[in-house]
Amino acid sequence: MVYIANGQVLDGQSRSPWRLSFLTDMFWGITDFIVMFFQSIIHPNVTRRGCQNSSSRTRFDDGRGPPGNPRRRMGRIDHNSGPNAPPMSGGGUGR
């Protein structure tokens, strides 16, 4: 990848992939993953905002609030009219 450093255009291929900053970033990334993995097993109801008990958490904790009214009127379900259900396929006798 091409990048600019100190006003010069440099090619990314000249940098070593095993430089110290890459190794330290990789180490801390793996360490954070392992710590978060075991924390999620030990305390599964901990979120970024802290511990969330099921009793203290409401349905609309994300700040959006309850949904509004439907935009159009829904039709009434009428069980007395309409076509009959199709017959079951396969028949009987284990076929």
Curated annotation (Swiss-Prot):
The chain crosses the membrane at residues 20-42. Keywords: Calcium, Calcium transport, Cell membrane, Endoplasmic reticulum, Ion transport, Membrane, Selenocysteine, Transmembrane, Transmembrane helix, Transport. The keyword Calcium applies. Residues 48-95 are annotated as: Disordered. Its main location: endoplasmic reticulum. GO terms for cellular component: endoplasmic reticulum; endoplasmic reticulum membrane; plasma membrane. GO terms for biological process: calcium ion transport; protein palmitoylation. It is found in: Endoplasmic reticulum membrane; Cell membrane. It is a single-pass membrane protein. Belongs to the selenoprotein K family. Required for Ca(2+) flux in immune cells and plays a role in T-cell proliferation and in T-cell and neutrophil migration. Involved in endoplasmic reticulum-associated degradation (ERAD) of soluble glycosylated proteins. Required for cell surface expression of CD36 and involved in macrophage uptake of low-density lipoprotein and in foam cell formation. Required for palmitoylation. This is Selenoprotein K. The lineage of its organism: Eukaryota, Metazoa, Chordata, Craniata, Vertebrata. The gene is selenok.
